[in-house]
Structures are given as C-alpha cells and as structure tokens.
Amino acid sequence: MPSFLRGILKPKERHHENKNHSQMSSDSLTSSYPTSPPKLEKTEAGSMVSSTTQKKTSHHAKPTITTKTEQSQRRPKIIDQVRRVESLGEQVSQKQRHMLESLINKVYTGPLGEELVQTLYLRIWAMKETPESTKILQMREDIRDQYLRMKTERWLRTLIRGKKTKLRDFQKRYEEVHPYLMMERVEQIIMEEAWKLAAHIVQE
C-alpha cells in the first residue's frame, strides 16, 4: 500500500487513541491531497498511480524520439537526393545536356533501350536474391521494362549533372553513393549500366 494512504486508512481504534495526532495527520493529508468519499479513495489513488506511470513512460519516450530525429539529420543527404533526382539540379553545360537528353530518349524509344532492359533483367536474374530483385522479376514484362528504364534515367541524371561533368566528378559521386549501393545490389547493377551508356558524354 502506498505510504500516503496509510494515514487515511488507519483503523478506527487507533484513530480514537491518537485523536490529536490523527487530526494533525488528517489536516496535513487534506492539504496535500483532494478530499473524496472513502469508497472512491482507492479508485482515485489507482488513477493517480496510473497517471504517474503514464508520465514516466512519456518522459522516457521523449529521448528515443529525439535520438531518431538526430539520426535522421545525420543521415547522408545524398541518399535522399539519389531517390529524388530533381533535387540534384540539371546539367548546365548545353552540349552535355543535349547529349544526355538524347541518350534518355533512346533509352525509352530506341533499340538501345530494348538492349538495356534485357541486360538488366539477365543481371538481376543471375544475382543473389533480394526483396527488390524478387519484386522486379515477378513484374509483368512491360511494367518491368518501364520500371528499369525509369531507374536508368534516374541514375543518368544523377551521374551527369552540374556545370560540366568530368571523370573526377563521377568518381566523387560514386564514392558518395557507394554505401547506399552496397545495401542495394539492384541499384548498383542499374547504376553500372547507366554509367556504361553515359561514359561517352563525360569523355567528350
């Protein structure tokens, strides 16, 4: 029994024997806790304990939320940028930009795109199974081809961007996304094929 309830629930005999002392205890308790009917004291005490428990729980939960927020803030921004290509900025060099857009158009419409999706499909089929590779292999063929083309375009725009992309720029960008690629083998395969297609743009 909580110590603050012992003075309230004392036997009547002890109450009569120590009337003065009991009266002082009662006054002290009355000033500390709200007066309530005897039958409701246990219920109110229970809810008080429950409220305290909830406060403790919420008090301990706050650092966890803060920690997750801090971790998300420390997470390398390049990972989110790879997933949202538009946040990377466009290719500024008019020549490279024209070559890039022409290449992307061929990926979607020409025989180059057909060869690309076949190569990607075979490489993904031959790799060690992952949730992503399983999802791709189970797709309907036309949906899968479009999905692979879109992912290739994303990597092309990720690799070829800025004022003028050179080989050292690609090396730097590859190092940025390397930890991400180590966790996403399918993305690594698509990035490699995208780089093969775009290498001539950088070498111009």
UniProtKB/Swiss-Prot annotation:
Biased composition, class Basic and acidic residues, residue ranges: 10-20
Keywords, comma-separated and alphabetical: Host-virus interaction, Inhibition of host innate immune response by virus, Inhibition of host interferon signaling pathway by virus, Inhibition of host STAT1 by virus, Inhibition of host STAT2 by virus, Interferon antiviral system evasion, Viral immunoevasion
Chain intervals with Low complexity compositional bias: 25-34
GO biological process per UniProt: symbiont-mediated suppression of host innate immune response; symbiont-mediated suppression of host JAK-STAT cascade via inhibition of STAT1 activity; symbiont-mediated suppression of host JAK-STAT cascade via inhibition of STAT2 activity; symbiont-mediated suppression of host type I interferon-mediated signaling pathway
Region (Disordered): 1-77
Keyword field contains Plastid: no
Family: Belongs to the respirovirus protein C family.
The protein's name: Protein C
Annotated source species: Human parainfluenza 1 virus (strain C35) (HPIV-1)
